[in-house]
């Protein structure tokens, strides 16, 4: 992609602040990778929400502005011992899929739901590293999908 194809295109990155120390790492991985792919750093607008459950509504509102060519969502949904996490994770992923299908703006998920997570150093370190990787993967997926969609016939 040449720089003239990138100019003026925006990407929204929505991040839950629950477990911020870990979820911030997805933002870091995404930002580093998107810049490596040739996008100017200021192409990405960052938005924060309290938790993952709030992400789909924000994604929908941002998609409807027409300003964004892609939206990325990042969050960590953990099992707090009351089986709620499965319902939250499903609602978030289903909501994100609906946003992209309803608005025609691609939405990428770095909302992760580990089988086991505890607030101890080993898990925090593991998931922090994993979120960097997933953020970078999301950047590459954004780039590939945006290019692919632009190549499709419009009528």
Curated annotation (Swiss-Prot):
Instruction: Please list the residues that bind 5-amino-6-(D-ribitylamino)uracil.
Output: 18, 52-54, 76-78, 109
SUPFAM superfamilies to which the protein is assigned, alphabetical: Lumazine synthase (SSF52121)
Q: Which GO terms describe its molecular function?
A: 6,7-dimethyl-8-ribityllumazine synthase activity
* Residues bound to (2S)-2-hydroxy-3-oxobutyl phosphate: 123
EC code(s) of this entry: 2.5.1.78
- Which keywords does this Swiss-Prot/TrEMBL entry list? Riboflavin biosynthesis, Transferase
Q: Where does it sit, as one GO cellular component term?
A: riboflavin synthase complex
Biological pathway: Cofactor biosynthesis; riboflavin biosynthesis; riboflavin from 2-hydroxy-3-oxobutyl phosphate and 5-amino-6-(D-ribitylamino)uracil: step 1/2
InterPro entries per UniProt: LS, LS/RS, LS/RS_sf
Please verify whether the record's keywords include Transferase: yes
Which chemical reaction does it catalyze? (2S)-2-hydroxy-3-oxobutyl phosphate + 5-amino-6-(D-ribitylamino)uracil = 6,7-dimethyl-8-(1-D-ribityl)lumazine + phosphate + 2 H2O + H(+)
Q: Which GO terms describe its biological process?
A: riboflavin biosynthetic process
Q: Where is the active site?
A: 84
What PANTHER family does the record point to? Answer: 6,7-DIMETHYL-8-RIBITYLLUMAZINE SYNTHASE, 6,7-DIMETHYL-8-RIBITYLLUMAZINE SYNTHASE DMRL SYNTHASE LUMAZINE SYNTHASE
Family note:
Belongs to the DMRL synthase family.
What name has this protein been given in UniProt? 6,7-dimethyl-8-ribityllumazine synthase
What is the native source organism of this protein? Rhodococcus erythropolis
Q: Gene that codes for this?
A: ribH
């Amino acid at each position: 992609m040449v720089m003239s194809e990138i100019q003026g295109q925006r990407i929204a990155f929505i991040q839950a602040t629950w477990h911020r120390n870990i979820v911030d790492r997805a933002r870091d991985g995404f930002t580093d990778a998107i810049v490596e792919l040739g996008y100017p750093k200021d192409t990405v607008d960052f938005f924060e929400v309290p938790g993952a459950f709030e992400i789909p509504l924000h994604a929908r509102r941002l998609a409807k502005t027409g300003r964004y060519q892609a939206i990325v969502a990042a969050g960590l949904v953990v099992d707090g011992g009351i089986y709620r996490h499965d319902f939250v994770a499903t609602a978030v992923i289903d909501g994100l899929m609906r946003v992209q299908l309803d608005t025609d703006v691609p939405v990428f998920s770095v909302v992760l739901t580990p089988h086991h997570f505890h607030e101890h150093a080993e898990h925090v370190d593991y998931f922090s590293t994993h979120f960097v990787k997933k953020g970078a993967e999301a950047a590459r997926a954004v780039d590939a999908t945006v290019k692919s969609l632009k190549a499709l016939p419009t009528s």
